[in-house]
Every structure is written in C-alpha cells, then in structure tokens.
Amino acid sequence: MPGFQSLRLDVLSPVDHSFPDYNPCYYLYFRSPSASDVRTSLQRGLEKLIKILPFITGEVVPCDGDRMEKRNGLLCIKYTASPDESLPIIEFREDMSLSVENISTSKTRTGLEDVHLAKTLAPLPLTPNPSRPSYVVRFRATTVRDGVVLAMSFSHFVFDATGAGHLMEHFAECVREPEPKPCDIDQETLRQALWHINGDTGVIPNEPGDCHSLPAFMLPPGGREAIPEMAAPGMRVCRWKISAAKVELLKNTCNDLLRSLDYKAGDNSVNFLSSQDVLTGLLTTCLKHDPKGKVEGSDIGVAVNLRNRLSPEWPTGYFGNMAKYAIAPGLAEPTAEELAVAHRLVAENPKILPAASDIARLYRNACSIRHTISQISDVHIRGFVSWLNSCKDLGPLTTPFPFINFTSWRHLNLYELDFGGALGYVDDIQTHGMMPTLGIILPRAKAVQGTEAHWDVLFYVKNEDYPAVMKQGLLRFLTVD
C-alpha cells in the first residue's frame, strides 16, 4: 500500500463551497451490451482513469491546521497521489426486475418509483449522511433484463454538472482506448486559482443576501439520506420530448414581441431570448398561474455556467464548480400592451396555436430569466468570489430554494460517448431521486436525418400541481408523442 508521504490534501475552491452537500448522479442506459465483457472493460477503464486523475479515489474532508485558523468550514479532497492499486470505486450488481426499455420509454413515474430506481441503481445517496465518508465519485454498473445501467454519483462539492460530464468523457475514453490521453488541464491549479480571481472588483452589493447558511429543519427518522424518500409520496416525475421546431417557433414569436415592446428591467434592456429562455419560461408559465398577479414565492432559479462569462474564459474542461443559480422574479401578469401585441402575432401566424395570453405570460417569464442571467458578468463573478473570500465561515453556504428550479445538461455530449466494444454508445440518459419543483433539460440526443434533436425534459412536480400542468395548452402544443 502507498506510504503516508503520498497523501494529498487539495483545498476546494470558494465556488465549490457555495454548493450544498449533495451527490447528483448520471444514469447511462445501454441496451443489450456484451454483459460478459462489461465488468472487465469498466474495471480496466477505471484503473486507467485513476492513474490519470487520482483525486477521484478521495474523500471530501474538513481542512485542519493553519488553513482552519483563517476560516471555518474549509473543505479539501484527501486522496493518495500515487495509488499502487485501484480502489473499489465501482460495484457490480444485477436486477432482472428492471428493463432499459421500460425505464427509458416511461413518460411518468410516481415519486416513490423514482426514488426506488435511485436506491437500486445509484452508488451514493443524493443526500449523504454526515457521519459517513463523503466520496468524490463512485460508480455502479447494474445488469438488467435487456442491458446495463452505468451510474456515476459525484460530490457537488467537487463537480458541477458540466465538470462531471467531462469526467464521464475521460472515463469513456479510458474504457475504449488501450492508451488514453492524459488530462490536458491541471485541475488542482485551476481550483486554487479561483481563490485569487477577485482582483480589485470588490464585493457585489447585496451578495450576502443571495448566499447564506442553510436553515435548520427537522430531519426524517432516517437522517439526511431519507430526505428524498420523505418527499417522494408528494411528487410526480414527468419526462417530455419537446418539439425543437415548435420551441424555435415560440422563440421567434417572443423575439418579435421583444422587438415591438423593448422589454426593460430597471436601466437594462433584454436584447434577445434564447430557446432555453423560452422553454424554461414556458414550463414556469405552465406550472402555476394566479390570475390576480404574482404568486408569493414564485421566483425562478436557473443554473448558469460561469466558464464562458469570465474574461478571459475559464477552461471548458474544468471539473470543479463554475456555476451559480440566478434567481429571477417570475409569474407577473402581462401588460395590456404586451397582450395586444401577442394577440396580433397569434392572429398573423396560424401555426401559433396557444392562446395569446399564454404567449404574453411566457414572454414575460422568458425576459425575466434572460435579464437575470445577463447580469452575471465577469465583474459579478469576481465580486461573488470576493464575497466568498470575505466569509469567515464557509460551511455550509448555499442559495435559497426558489419556487421552481431549472438546470440544463443539453450541452453535455454524453450521447456521443463511445465506451468501446463491450458497451458501445449510450442509448438513454436520465437522473433519478431528485426533489420538486425541478426541471432538468437532459443532454441533447443524436439528431435524426439532419433535423434538430428534440428537447428532452425531466420535470419533478408536486402532486398538487401535476393536474394543472398537464392541462396546459402550451405544454400540449410542444410535446411530441
């Protein structure tokens, strides 16, 4: 076994400390692989991956010594820099009661069914028990009736969704290639560099109001690990295929509204709306609408990738957290002018089937989201890090939970990954065991015959909101059978 001198303690970045203690999980579904070769291929691939990225064998632990004298709650990754043997970071199981075909084609599940899938397939619980080791990453390969499910749980202290996607890219290459390329980015140097990017920008006004300690709450009998199970009876999980062509139509319509109305929030104008702005605005509109005006607590949380918002841009292949939740006000009623323009646009284009009032509400929510995202600039990010640096206690810090949350994995190229002969390409990608109200835009599937791939949305919704959501004309207009 390696000696003590090879033990490493890598301090997490300030942005890492702004995320809660969760273990999200990617579930990659493969139909009918060569089951006898899967175990050997994955084990050999992990051995190569560990040699390239030894920190993935580690645990997240509190820092000690001189570092802790400067601030409380500082965390680091403890691992062996040069392991002599691969650690058991993958386990193999069988469950012939499950089917890739059934799970991947299911359009809706109860919360209990979804949590059961997470408990069966995930190597780590979503909400870890503080008394147990907090692992950087763990894998589980489960053989089911018609294929294999490869699940990767990762600590949100160490990876954001984009970073975990890049790790999976490296893993696929290690499984496929006899001699994979080394990681061309020094992850530890970048992680430490984030402590020093604030420069002279100072602290963003009101930033402490956006980031605060988690409130105390009553834990269920099973502790933190049982939180998803406690929430499960009160929720529904929906999976929708959303027509890319119709999202494009609504995006163009909303941008026509924008050009006619010149949406402003304070002193700042919104110049354009993206397809993702429109889709998240639409799902927010479908979720809850109060004809009397803004719903109390109706803010919209959107996860924003910060890598390309710094100047110069942060390396795309960075594993660590470079994301932040943008909190946008939502669900305000459209103005009379907005309704009038929406009525005109709907009347002029027979392809627009939703009601003009729904289009106007969608437009307002999309503009609110775009305006909020556009405020996350280079100066804002550096100021955010400056504020984190000023905190004497970093544990735990997190953003408050808005009325509805969205995160997008559409940019992840997980469907393009080739795991080689034993597994091949991924047939389906999901996640399980999350909590409402959350919309996840899943990775973009391969396009068929040159057409734009449909949007793939996983939606965690409370049971009380589910009937109203399913009745919404906007949603019926967009979904693909």
UniProtKB/Swiss-Prot annotation:
Lineage: Eukaryota, Fungi, Dikarya, Ascomycota, Pezizomycotina
Role, per record: O-acetyltransferase; part of the gene cluster that mediates the biosynthesis of anditomin, a fungal meroterpenoid. The first step of the pathway is the synthesis of 3,5-dimethylorsellinic acid (DMOA) by the polyketide synthase andM. DMOA is then converted to the phthalide compound 5,7-dihydroxy-4,6-dimethylphthalide (DHDMP) by the cytochrome P450 monooxygenase andK, which is further prenylated by the prenyltransferase andD to yield farnesyl-DHDMP. Further epoxidation by the FAD-dependent monooxygenase andE leads to epoxyfarnesyl-DHDMP.
Signal peptide segment: none
Keyword Acyltransferase attached: yes
Alphabetical UniProt keywords: Acyltransferase, Transferase
Annotated metabolic or biological route of this protein: Secondary metabolite biosynthesis; terpenoid biosynthesis
Entry similarity comment: Belongs to the fumigaclavine B O-acetyltransferase family.
Keyword field contains Cell wall biogenesis/degradation: no
InterPro entries associated with the record: CAT-like_dom_sf, Plant_Fungal_Acyltransferase
Name this protein carries in UniProt: O-acetyltransferase andG
PANTHER family: O-ACYLTRANSFERASE AUSQ, TRICHOTHECENE 3-O-ACETYLTRANSFERASE
Molecular function (Gene Ontology), one example: acyltransferase activity, transferring groups other than amino-acyl groups
Quaternary organization: Monomer.
A single BP term in Gene Ontology: terpenoid biosynthetic process
EC number from the UniProt entry: 2.3.1.-
Gene3D superfamilies linked to this entry: Chloramphenicol acetyltransferase-like domain
